Amino acid sequence: MWSFANDRFAARVYFCSNTAVPRQRNPIRPKILIFDVDGVLVDVRGTYWRSALETVRHLSGKRVTYAELHKWKSKPGNNDDWAMTAAWLTALGRPTTYDEARATFEKFYWGTDGKPGLVRNEKLLITPVQIQRWAKRYELNLFTGRTRQEFSFTFKRWAGTEYFRRVITMDDAKKKPDPEGLRMILDGRDPAAALYVGDNIDDALAARGARVPFAAIVAAGDAGYRQRMARFRELGALALLARARDLNQLLVK
């Protein structure tokens, strides 16, 4: 058994890519896998990220970039896109409330007046077959910053959904980085028996708060990815992975 505070594991960080993947001398043996959704199971670059950019551009009248978006996403407390866009707009000199940011964001995300929303651009990054394989070996759960409505829209027809024991959305628990959602999933069980896989600083902070080991998804080439890698190392990530399926390189077979 291993624990989050074990420096031997925390110092052993891997970045899996399309090239050679280093052999794991210390593979891990969790019993429970907990996944974030956005950036882990679902590609949200054309949906949530784009909606955030369009919201800031629309309300501020200024041209903003994905590089700026990543700087804001890397700040603790900004896993909530509505809170992030409100803070971003205010910093640009256009004071914006949470409710105004959310209302504008959702117009781009869901669409209005018969105009399709960006939500239709969402793409799943993991196949149901891979989820089924993991489900044969581990208990699977989800802890996401999505609302229940957003989660259901994307996952209601996905065959992999049935394999998750529990799904905790932002409607069910306090927002990340609060670890309440992870603790609800554990339900008194040993945190060291789990592994949380996420792509956001708030995911890592929630894992640390719940004393759950953490693996970070960091796609090479994304704006600011080197800075995010360094920050995840500081927070004790067991591994840095290019994509969720690289988790297979980390787990004991």
Language-model-detected regions and their locations in the chain:
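Non-catalytic pre-domain segments flanking phosphatase-related domains
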Residues: 2-35, 87, 96-100, 252
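Short acidic-hydrophobic, aromatic-tinged amphipathic segments that line or gate anion-handling sites
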Residues: 239-243
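Short amphipathic alpha-helix with an adjacent loop that forms part of the alpha/beta core around
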Residues: 247-253
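N-terminal helical cap/lid subdomain that shapes the substrate entry/recognition surface
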Residues: 28-37, 41-127, 149
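Residues at the starts of beta-strands that form the adenosine-phosphate
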Residues: 139, 193, 213
